[in-house]
Amino acid sequence: VRGITHLGGTILGTTNRGNPLKWPIRADGGAVTYMDRSQEVVDALERLEVDALISIGGDGSLEIAHALSQKGLKVVGVPKTIDNDLEATSVTFGFHTAVDTATDAIGKLHSTAESHQRVMVVEVMGRNAGWIALSSGVAGTADVILIPEIPYDMDIVCEKIQDRYASGREFAIVVVAEGAFPKGSKPLFKQEDDGQKRLGGMAEQVAHDIHERTGRETRHLVLGHLQRGGGP
């Protein structure tokens, strides 16, 4: 590891595509079924004389690692995810880096929001966990923080923003976790080119709702994969 320990990213390359526990098989008619091919993974590693597998990742990677361990493979699981949504560890690798990035972005938005007297809505990652939104929102002194664990009430959100403007502070910062959703509703998903559904679109929706209800000039920003980069 000499010369690479200070670098971000994955020097060997990586992927989160393909799940041997649920491998898609497409029939001639187009129908897709799924099969468990995890035993083939174990057999291949044995042929290669691999003694053990070190799995570095989030819940998906570690779910696969656990299944392989159940088949007799020696496995070490390393909790690596910006979402900080794994048990058996207080903080996952990558979480603090993502929070630092999000906090920095929120801090920079304060000046433009104040200059133009706007409401700025920032969407951060985290999937169904609100750790990044909560931590970066508190550190960045956001006025409203919306997380998946607590479905929000848009009336209360708008009331908070109006109260802030009425007090003479004519701008506001709203941090939204990508998995957040209002009471009585569900998280928003976007259809990707590969056919998969991914969380996203909440910042745009929240910004639209705030503008419609308050008349305040509102902008939204999605930080996206910027949160996944950078050195450790």
Q: Residues of each region from the PLM?
A:
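Accessory alpha-helical/coil subdomains and C-terminal extensions
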Residues: 44, 52-57, 63-67, 74, ...
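Glycine-rich nucleotide/cofactor/substrate-binding loop typically near the N-terminus or early
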Residues: 1-46
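Short beta-strand elements at the ligand-binding edges of bilobed clamshell
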Residues: 88-99, 230-232
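Extracytoplasmic ligand/sensor domains, especially the bilobed periplasmic-binding protein
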Residues: 15, 67, 71-87, 96
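Acidic/polar active-site rim loop that often engages polyanionic ligands
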Residues: 78-91, 114-115, 139-140
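Acidic, glycine-rich active-site loops and adjacent beta-strand->loop/helix elements
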Residues: 16-18, 59-60, 81-84, 126-128, ...
